[in-house]
């Protein structure tokens, strides 16, 4: 169906926006967007259609300067949200080009969302996980990379998945366990985000471990497929002219988990995850400017260990006699050794110098001396 528009108004009529016509108008709008989205000079029109006919957002009148600076307000009720989620699931499940699907998804959910769109996005992705909707999860993985896996939007999506499938579920659903096979790129980017939520002193003054079921799920993913972390390096399928944002692998965040875990937990799952990460590092092939283990992420681990050692000093405990610290350093040294050998750490000398500032550990000392030459 062609999309003809005069200079003042869209072909889609206001009368089409009656509640009894929803979500028909949203479905029609999605179809029409496919022909518009390739035209760079029609992006404002695309955004207007999305806001008005898909999300039912009301924009304040231009005459009121104060109101015009406010975010558009969605007039959708819960039932209409449910209808839209079903319509989007069906739309993204249709045969079509990945580039078109990704362009539509990025237009629907950009990097600056209203609270209503953000909540709907989280519900949409959880529904896609529950229904194993591979095409939508593929687009969601692309979206996460484009907006940043550690941005508040991506973290909200990750936290919502944890809440839906872990926190409020007695048993981890099979759909979540099978996620790497259904949507490997999304699963890898989900791990980047969720790893940032736990055992991270930049987000909480205390080291909060991940829920046991989440740890077990990610450990199972990594044990079955150590190369899953590399799925985030897959080339993105974007519309013409779009620039792919740098990828981030989950390796650094998960490494922080296993290194710092002895300070708060003695679960054996961390040992299994550690071994899987070592295998993943061994299989890693560094390419381009984006490396698997940015030194600043590893330095964050060092700072957490320094803080722990400072607390040990206050209690007059020798780090060499502290079993938790020794276990942390053993895991850290093993990972650093393999990562350095694989040449996948940036600013290696700076990292080695910072590692020397930690209380001495026999294995780490050997690693530092071997690579500082």
From Swiss-Prot:
One of its GO terms (cellular component) is integrator complex. Keywords: Nucleus. It is found in: Nucleus. It comes from the Eukaryota. InterPro entries: INTS15. Belongs to the Integrator subunit 15 family. Belongs to the multiprotein complex Integrator, at least composed of IntS1, IntS2, IntS3, IntS4, omd/IntS5, IntS6, defl/IntS7, IntS8, IntS9, IntS10, IntS11, IntS12, asun/IntS13, IntS14 and IntS15. The core complex associates with protein phosphatase 2A subunits mts/PP2A and Pp2A-29B, to form the Integrator-PP2A (INTAC) complex. Component of the integrator complex, a multiprotein complex that terminates RNA polymerase II (Pol II) transcription in the promoter-proximal region of genes. The integrator complex provides a quality checkpoint during transcription elongation by driving premature transcription termination of transcripts that are unfavorably configured for transcriptional elongation: the complex terminates transcription by (1) catalyzing dephosphorylation of the C-terminal domain (CTD) of Pol II subunit Rbp1 and Spt5, and (2) degrading the exiting nascent RNA transcript via endonuclease activity. This is Integrator complex subunit 15.
């Amino acid at each position: 169906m062609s999309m003809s528009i005069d200079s003042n108004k869209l072909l889609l009529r206001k009368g089409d926006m009656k509640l009894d016509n929803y979500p028909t108008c949203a479905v029609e709008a999605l179809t029409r967007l496919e022909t518009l989205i390739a035209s760079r000079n029609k992006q404002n029109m695309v955004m207007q259609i999305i806001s008005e006919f898909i999300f039912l957002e009301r924009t304040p009148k231009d005459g009121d300067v104060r109101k015009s600076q406010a975010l558009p307000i969605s007039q959708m009720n819960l039932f209409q949200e449910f209808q839209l989620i079903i319509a989007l699931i069906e739309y993204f499940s249709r045969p079509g080009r990945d580039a078109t699907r990704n362009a539509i998804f990025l237009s629907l959910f950009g990097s600056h969302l209203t609270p209503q769109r953000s909540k709907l996005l989280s519900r949409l992705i959880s529904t896609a996980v529950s229904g194993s909707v591979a095409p939508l999860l593929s687009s969601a993985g692309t979206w996460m990379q484009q907006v940043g896996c550690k941005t508040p939007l991506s973290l909200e999506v990750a936290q919502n998945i944890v809440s839906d499938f872990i926190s409020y579920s007695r048993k981890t659903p099979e759909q979540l366990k099978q996620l790497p096979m259904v949507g490997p790129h999304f699963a890898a980017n989900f791990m980047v985000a969720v790893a940032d939520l736990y055992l991270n002193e930049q987000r909480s003054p205390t080291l909060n471990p991940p829920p046991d079921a989440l740890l077990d799920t990610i450990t199972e993913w990594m044990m079955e497929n150590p190369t899953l972390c590399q799925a985030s390096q897959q080339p993105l399928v974007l519309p013409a002219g779009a620039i792919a944002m740098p990828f981030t692998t989950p390796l650094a965040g998960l490494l922080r988990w296993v290194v710092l875990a002895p300070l708060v937990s003695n679960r054996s799952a961390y040992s299994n995850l550690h071994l899987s990460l070592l295998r993943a590092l061994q299989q890693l092939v560094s390419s381009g400017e984006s490396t698997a283990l940015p030194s600043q992420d590893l330095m964050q681990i060092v700072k957490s260990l320094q803080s722990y050692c400072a607390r040990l000093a206050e209690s007059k405990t020798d780090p060499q006699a502290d079993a938790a610290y020794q276990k942390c350093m053993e895991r850290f040294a093993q990972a650093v050794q393999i990562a350095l050998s694989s040449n996948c750490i940036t600013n290696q000398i700076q990292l080695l110098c910072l590692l020397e500032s930690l209380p001495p550990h026999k294995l780490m000392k050997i690693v530092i001396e071997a690579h500082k030459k």
